[in-house]
Amino acid sequence: MSKRESAKHKIDRRLGENIWGRPKSPVNRREYGPGQHGQRRKGKLSDFGVQLRAKQKLKGFYGDISEKQFRKTYEEAARRKGDTGENLIGLLESRLDAVVYRAKFVPTIFAARQFINHGHVNVNGRRVNIQSYRLKVGDVVEVREKSKQLAIVLEAVQLAERDVPDYIDVDHNKMVATYNRVPGLSDVPYAVQMEPNLVVEFYSR
């Protein structure tokens, strides 16, 4: 099992949910967490526990980004006008790694981060190797020419388990995606329920 596959399985088991909707998720086979004590019945979570779980789930979905980076994103969402939870989703979905994943250029969010790190992606014609790079509406993301025939790319395009959301236009023949608009929670095709309002409550304590 690769390190990326192990990380995905660990997050799913820890949360007890198949947060990416993957057929091979370990939680499809069992209903308890990792470790020798994973089979013990879980008690009812406190309000804090529910809020913490919501944060862990959202943070985990985007590749288990660091607490420092996630909190920084939340604080930016809180400073903006409008609903903080909706702003948070919009900021997370405008990350370059999220758009590369949503566009089906790679099979997983973890693969997206590595793909970007290795210099396989251009934004508006220039190479960008920063996972958290913030896209603006109208930005064009393209797989670099020499990378278009990589097995990981060809495999991802064929994945039937997820569709490209309508806030991203994709041409898989050219391997080009345009970020059309900032989505709200209802626009994002999460495989499980995400509750950014609980994340706001967590950080507002």
Swiss-Prot record:
A Pfam match: Ribosomal_S4
Keyword Amino-acid biosynthesis: no
One term of GO molecular function: structural constituent of ribosome
Entry annotated with the keyword Kinase: no
Keywords for the protein's UniProt record, in alphabetical order: Ribonucleoprotein, Ribosomal protein, RNA-binding, rRNA-binding
One Gene Ontology cellular component: small ribosomal subunit
Domain (S4 RNA-binding): residue spans on this chain: 94-157
InterPro entries given in the database record: Ribosomal_uS4, Ribosomal_uS4_bac-type, Ribosomal_uS4_CS, Ribosomal_uS4_N, S4_RNA-bd, S4_RNA-bd_sf
Swiss-Prot/TrEMBL GO biological process terms: ribosomal small subunit biogenesis; translation
Region named Disordered: 1-46
Record field: compositional bias (Basic and acidic residues): 1-16
Gene3D superfamilies in UniProt: Ribosomal Protein S4 Delta 41, Chain A, domain 1 (1.10.1050.10), RNA-binding S4 domain (3.10.290.10)
UniProt function note: One of the primary rRNA binding proteins, it binds directly to 16S rRNA where it nucleates assembly of the body of the 30S subunit. With S5 and S12 plays an important role in translational accuracy.
Assembly and interaction partners: Part of the 30S ribosomal subunit. Contacts protein S5. The interaction surface between S4 and S5 is involved in control of translational fidelity.
Family statement: Belongs to the universal ribosomal protein uS4 family.
Name of this protein: Small ribosomal subunit protein uS4
Originating species: Brucella abortus (strain 2308)
